[in-house]
UniProtKB/Swiss-Prot annotation:
Monomer. Coiled coil: none annotated. InterPro entries: BlueCu_1, BlueCu_1_BS, Cu_oxidase_CS, Cupredoxin, Rusticyanin. It is found in: Periplasm. Residues 1-32 form the signal peptide. This is Rusticyanin. Electron carrier from cytochrome c552 to the A-type oxidase. Keywords: Copper, Electron transport, Metal-binding, Periplasm, Signal, Transport. GO terms for molecular function: copper ion binding; electron transfer activity.
Length: 187
């Protein structure tokens, strides 16, 4: 008889196997887009300085932005956070509230030394399949390189949203299915 813990363990094994298979046949890159050559490298002190540039204010599990130009800084799997997840202002997968009509400058940092990640924006909400098909409206970052040599990868993009509800999602197989996504409310 399966217990809840056994079923959960089997589910994670299945997700992991699917992700490994997808990576083996090249589907991980296909799901997240092509390897983006705009990625740059940063040291840990540089990453810490970038994280400080986020212009949002935290209230509970929400980060609220104001003004005509906002700067969102999201990181993939900072130390002390569960894998896989995004962190903004030391919050795991927070809801981001952004004013309609604002220019949104996004910096996405991959600090996870074991995996590449993506930060894509879509209208499709959860739940997400192991192999997500989300039709991103902003294929934000492409597929990140895996950090190496004591450095981390980061990239920037700009988004001009209209009012509505969106989601930021990692399209690497298995990541969104296990919780690597968050909500964006533009109003």
């Amino acid at each position: 008889m399966y217990t809840q813990n056994t079923m959960k363990k089997n589910w994670y094994v299945t997700v992991g196997a699917a992700a490994a298979l997808a990576a083996t046949v090249g589907m991980g890159t296909a799901m997240a887009g092509t390897l983006d050559t705009t990625w740059k490298e940063a040291t840990l002190p540089q990453v810490k300085a970038m994280l400080e540039k986020d212009t949002g204010k935290v209230s509970g599990d929400t980060v609220t932005y104001s003004g005509k130009t906002v700067h969102v800084v999201a990181a993939a799997v900072l130390p002390g956070f569960p894998f896989p997840s995004f962190e903004v202002h030391d919050k795991k997968n927070p809801t981001l509230e952004i004013p309609a009509g604002a220019t949104v400058d996004v910096t996405f940092i991959n600090t996870n030394k074991g995996f590449g990640h993506s930060f894509d924006i879509t209208k499709k909400g959860p739940p997400y399949a192991v192999m997500p098909v989300i039709d991103p409206i902003v294929a934000g970052t492409g597929f990140s390189p895996v950090p190496k040599d004591g450095k981390f990868g980061y990239t920037d993009f700009t988004w001009h949203p209209t009012a509505g509800t969106y989601y930021y999602v990692c399209q690497i197989p298995g990541h969104a299915a296990t919780g690597m996504f968050g909500k964006i409310v533009v109003k």
